[in-house]
Amino acid sequence: MIAHFAREGYVTLPDFLPPAELPGLQRLCEAILVERVESAQAAGGFGWDGTTTLWVRLRREEELILEALPLGPRLRHTAAALLGAAPADLRIGGRIFYKAPRVGRALPFHQDEAHRDPAFVHNSLNAFLALDPATPCSGGLRYLPGSHTQGIRTHVAIGGMHEAVGIPDVDPAGVVTPSLQPGAAAFHHCRLVHASGDNTADHPRRAFVFVCEAPPQRLATPLPRPWLASSLSTAELQY
């Protein structure tokens, strides 16, 4: 596991979540999604109808619920082993990614570290915990193996969309798209070039995604990342 992650920049664990734990996490995911949408609508926010992609940052109290489950220490120790860090040193933040059936949109190739504070070298990974089948048809993750060893690539606006900042020139020949069944997990390094496809399946693609961060290393001079000004607010740079 550790050797594969170091070489390829990602690793998939098909049996990461025992079957008995899956229904509870699926129910928790649905409850959070419903609460967020209802709260936003009540406040006069967006009118989400369930037919688009939805990204939700978990509140601290929701993260604490997950940390108290058997999933919590399992996630922390697995991520720490892959990053070569002490489990207690990790900061872990949670999100929910929801891609609606047949209409959930693709995300362009990018590197997570390219969207983080350029004053640091980051040592982190994303853990994608599938709650539905995540396959090439349902918008599964697409990885460029080994690309995490090649530095940060230039990111540009894709298709003129403000929120879609990515890498335009990735050769698809080397890309892999692992298929994950519910309960499987995929871990990828913050410098790995990756994307996700459209959801053309008849089912949603729900996932908990956990950003697991070991302490970053401060640089004497911040790295140039001009795309940050157009793709992120400074509030997103929480380091």
Regions of interest found by a model, annotated:
Residues L17-P19, F97-K99, V103, A114, ...:
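Short, solvent-exposed loop/turn segments at secondary-structure junctions
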Residues A134-A195, Q217-A220, A235-L237:
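Double-stranded beta-helix
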